[in-house]
Amino acid sequence: MNPTPLKVWIDSIRSLLCPPVGNKLLFGAGQHKVMVVGGPNVRTDYHVEAGEEFFLQLEGDMELLIIPRAGAEGLVIPIREGEAFILPAHVPHSPQRRAGTVGFVMERERLPGEMDALRWYRPNWTVLYEERFACVDLGKELRPVIERFNASEAKRTGEPPPLGEVGAPPSNDELEPDAPPFVQPINLRTWAADARSRGITGTTPLWGPGAPAPRDTSEYSIIAHIGAENSEGKWSAWVKPPGELFLYQRELWGAVAVRRVGDSGDGEERVLKENDVLLVPAGAFEVRVSMEANAFCLEVTNPRIKQ
């Protein structure tokens, strides 16, 4: 449970971020699936899952193609460097990444019975080909589906396979309910600078309970910690997270103290340098954080996941 220097880690695996998917898992053994995705990555497939996805663009810009509801025309959501975006559950989406760009994507572990889908559309936005699968590591699971589609009659003819065959679109799509509200990406650096200019420090919800509507309906809870000018080194109260806790030190330095539930001591302190990330396991720990003056850290949990 030590911090990982994110930029150093990305440089160490950059050569592995290659088509057709370009994913590399940073954390994946527990509740959060945290991955880094590199370009070029221009895809024709659309991914669908039953949970939300958290996008944060680290290097360069990307575009996220989405289908807001069944039969609707595709839309483009630009996500620029430094911006964060939460994609609502069940929305078909196709990430488009240019060469030299790097982004960070977080998904939750799948609940019992949940299935992911990978699909391709015809020009009239009806489904041409679809496969469903139990998802553990997208970086490994998408490639064989893409290869099967590329070798399929559906790709050659532009007609979907008959019902019952591999790739046949389902007759009733429970993965795709009515379109949820979409919230535009947030530029984190701009948001933090604006918060400081208005004297907002401490803990502020960005998504989830306590966040401005409609971001308050998110299943993710994403909280910003900003260090105050006059309270450097002040610790927050001890909190028991609702599950795995992910921390990303965006600007300057901070620290996190971790102790087992039931202990009364100060816990074990870990320094968070700029661009460090840390994953605290679920269930047995309490945490508190401290930010130096003007520092900015993101805290991510997903209360929907049961411990």
Model segments located where?
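Jelly-roll (double-stranded beta-helix
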Residues: 1-81, 92-307
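N-terminal extracellular ligand-recognition/capping segment immediately after the signal peptide
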Residues: 87-91
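Ferredoxin-like iron-sulfur electron-transfer modules
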Residues: 84
